[in-house]
C-alpha cells in the first residue's frame, strides 16, 4: 500500500503541481489585465503639450511630480461675469480656495476636445457644446503641483443651469469684484494667473455681442 502511494506521489503529484502552477500563473496574468484595464492613466507632457509617456492617475494627481501632467480648466461666463465657487475639501491642491467651476485631468488616449467635453458633460450635462471654446495653454508649477493647463471658456446666455445644489457657495462674480480680492490668498493660484486673460476675453466677447 505504501509503495503504491509513493508511486502515485512520484508519477501524479509533479504534473499536478506543474499544471496548478500554470493555472495560477494564468489567473495572475488574467487578474493583472483586468486591473490594468480599469487603471486610469494620465499623459506625461512637455511644456509644449507633446506626450512623452503616461503615469497612473492616482499617483500623478495626489502629489507633485517632476513630470508635467495636462489639466483642463473651464471658466463659465454669463452676462460678462464668471461663475466661481470654493474648491472641494477633498482636493489635494488648494482646497476651499475660490476657483472656476470645472477642472480635470486629461486622460491618456483622449484628445483635448474629448477631455473637455467629458469634463463639461460630468458637471453641466445640458450645457451647449458649441459654446465651449479653447483659449490658451500655460505651464504652472509651484510647491504643490506641476501642470500644463488648457483653459477653456463656456459662454452661457441662460445661467439657470448654474442653480444647482451641488455647486455650494457658487455665484457669479463681476471682474471688478474679483479684482478687489486678488493677491489676498482668496482665489486659487491658477485663477490669479488667469484673471487678466479671462477679463480681456470676456470683455471682448461682450463687446462683440453688443455690436
Task: Show where each model-derived region lies.
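Short, small-residue-biased leader/transition segments that mark boundaries at the very start
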Residues: 1-7
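Intrinsically disordered, low-complexity segments enriched in serine/proline and basic residues
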Residues: 10-16
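Transmembrane-cytosolic junction motif
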Residues: 23-36
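Acidic, metal-coordinating catalytic segment for phosphate/diphosphate chemistry
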Residues: 34-73
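Conserved Nudix-box catalytic region and its N-terminal flanking loop in Nudix hydrolases
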Residues: 58-72, 77-118
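Active-site segment of metal-dependent pyrophosphate-handling enzymes
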Residues: 90, 111-113, 117, 121-160
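NUDIX/MutT-family hydrolases
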Residues: 103, 151-153, 162-191
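Charged phosphate-binding loop/patch that engages nucleotide di/tri-phosphates or the phosphate backbone
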Residues: 189-211
Amino acid at each position: 500500500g505504501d509503495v503504491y502511494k509513493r508511486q502515485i506521489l512520484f508519477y501524479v503529484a509533479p504534473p499536478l503541481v506543474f499544471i496548478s502552477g500554470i493555472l495560477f500563473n494564468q489567473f495572475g496574468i488574467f487578474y493583472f489585465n483586468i486591473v490594468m484595464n480599469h487603471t486610469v492613466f494620465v499623459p506625461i507632457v512637455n511644456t509644449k503639450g507633446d506626450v512623452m509617456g503616461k503615469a497612473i492617475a492616482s499617483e500623478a494627481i495626489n502629489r507633485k511630480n517632476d513630470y508635467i501632467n495636462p489639466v483642463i480648466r473651464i471658466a463659465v461666463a454669463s452676462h460678462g461675469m464668471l461663475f466661481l465657487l470654493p474648491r472641494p475639501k477633498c482636493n489635494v491642491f488648494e482646497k476651499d480656495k475660490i476657483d472656476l467651476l470645472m477642472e480635470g485631468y486629461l486622460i491618456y488616449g483622449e484628445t483635448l476636445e474629448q477631455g473637455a467635453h467629458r469634463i463639461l458633460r460630468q458637471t453641466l450635462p445640458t450645457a451647449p457644446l458649441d459654446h465651449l471654446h479653447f483659449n490658451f495653454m500655460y505651464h504652472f508649477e509651484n510647491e504643490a503641483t506641476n501642470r500644463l493647463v488648457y483653459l477653456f471658456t463656456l459662454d452661457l446666455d441662460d445661467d439657470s443651469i448654474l442653480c444647482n445644489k451641488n455647486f455650494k457657495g457658487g455665484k457669479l462674480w463681476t471682474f471688478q469684484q474679483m479684482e478687489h480680492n486678488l493677491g489676498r490668498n482668496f482665489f486659487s493660484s491658477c485663477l490669479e494667473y488667469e484673471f487678466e486673460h479671462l477679463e480681456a476675453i470676456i470683455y471682448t466677447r461682450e463687446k462683440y455681442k453688443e455690436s
